[in-house]
Amino acid sequence: KRQIYKRISGCGSGTEYMAVTPWGDLYPCHQFVGDPKYLMGDIWKGVTNTAVRDEFKHCNAYARKECQDCWAKLYCSGGCAANSYHATGSITGVYEYGCELFRKRMECAIMIQVAQNQELAAQGIEVPIQLGSTCNACADGEACE
């Protein structure tokens, strides 16, 4: 069973992983290496610039006003912080070209899945489609809407 997982953050840069230079400097990801604004610390003293870590901690789909009404916001989750930074000057900016590409990829993936399900149905193979999920909060145990 193939699933596309929902997530809040586009990546774990600065929080779940960091880039380490040959000299021991720590950056949120490899795309920020050499930018003094995003130097987080080094391997000897650890993270000393906690403001950068905190900035990346709050970099998610909910931090971007432009993402609020997007149907794909919990799949792309605001995308790559470095792409946003290089396109807009802010890690919470919106890299519009990346958004368009991601939404188109999701649309294509959905259409491919629909086509595959139609082929299976034409062969008489039942393909269950789950429109809701049973949360057991409802007295009748039916799927929530």
What are these regions (language model features)?
Residues K1-D35, Y75, G124-E145:
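A C-terminal junction/extension of Radical SAM enzymes
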Residues T21, Y27, G41, A81, ...:
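Residues in well-ordered beta-strands of folded domains
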Residues K1, H30-S77:
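C-terminal accessory region of radical SAM enzymes
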Residues K37, Y62-E145:
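Radical SAM enzyme core and accessory elements
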Residues R7-S9, C59, T88:
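Residues embedded in well-ordered secondary-structure elements
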Residues E16, K45-T48, K104:
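Short capping/connector residues at structural and topological boundaries
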